[in-house]
């Protein structure tokens, strides 16, 4: 049974400005494993990754019906890749199945998350 659906978007230009300021925002938003992946990236890919992970966490919190804040924090949600390069999302705040989707172009990053109860 579907528990929730969340969608979010962020402008690439906004993320570029954040990345240019250094790693403090990335360290706040990304889990240690996500941050380790982020540090290996450069340029456009780094912007897409940070923006995508931020937006996925927003989408997850919307699907939970809480938004980011008191119940769901940045460190409660992690998205890594499986062996085929698909995003795999886990959370300490939800025990069911999580289906993330992400797309981006030169202007926008859009994410979508579906939560399914077990």
UniProtKB/Swiss-Prot annotation:
Binding annotation for Mg(2+): 8, 58
Main location: cytoplasm
Subcellular location: Cytoplasm
Classification via InterPro entries: 4-PPantetheinyl_Trfase_dom, 4-PPantetheinyl_Trfase_dom_sf, ACPS, Ppantetheine-prot_Trfase_dom
Enzyme Commission identifier(s): 2.7.8.7
GO CC, one annotated term: cytoplasm
Keywords (A to Z) from UniProt: Cytoplasm, Fatty acid biosynthesis, Fatty acid metabolism, Lipid biosynthesis, Lipid metabolism, Magnesium, Metal-binding, Transferase
Superkingdom field: Bacteria
A GO biological-process term: fatty acid biosynthetic process
Broadest EC class assigned to this enzyme: transferase
Reactions catalysed: apo-[ACP] + CoA = holo-[ACP] + adenosine 3',5'-bisphosphate + H(+)
Cofactor(s) listed: Mg(2+)
NCBIfam families from the UniProt entry: acpS, pantethn_trn
Function summary: Transfers the 4'-phosphopantetheine moiety from coenzyme A to a Ser of acyl-carrier-protein.
Family indicated by similarity: Belongs to the P-Pant transferase superfamily. AcpS family.
Listed HAMAP family: AcpS
Name under which the protein is recorded: Holo-[acyl-carrier-protein] synthase
Organism for this UniProt entry: Lactobacillus helveticus (strain DPC 4571)
Gene field: acpS
């Amino acid at each position: 049974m579907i528990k929730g659906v969340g969608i979010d978007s962020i402008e690439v230009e906004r993320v570029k400005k954040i990345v240019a300021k250094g790693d403090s925002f990335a360290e706040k938003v990304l889990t240690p494993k996500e941050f380790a992946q982020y540090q290996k990236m450069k340029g456009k890919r780094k912007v897409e990754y940070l923006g995508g992970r931020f937006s996925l966490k927003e989408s997850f919190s919307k699907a939970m019906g809480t938004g980011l804040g008191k119940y769901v924090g940045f460190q409660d949600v992690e998205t890594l890749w499986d062996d085929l390069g698909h995003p795999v999302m886990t959370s300490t705040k939800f025990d069911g199945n999580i289906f993330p989707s992400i797309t981006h172009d030169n202007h926008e990053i859009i994410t979508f998350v579906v939560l399914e109860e077990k």
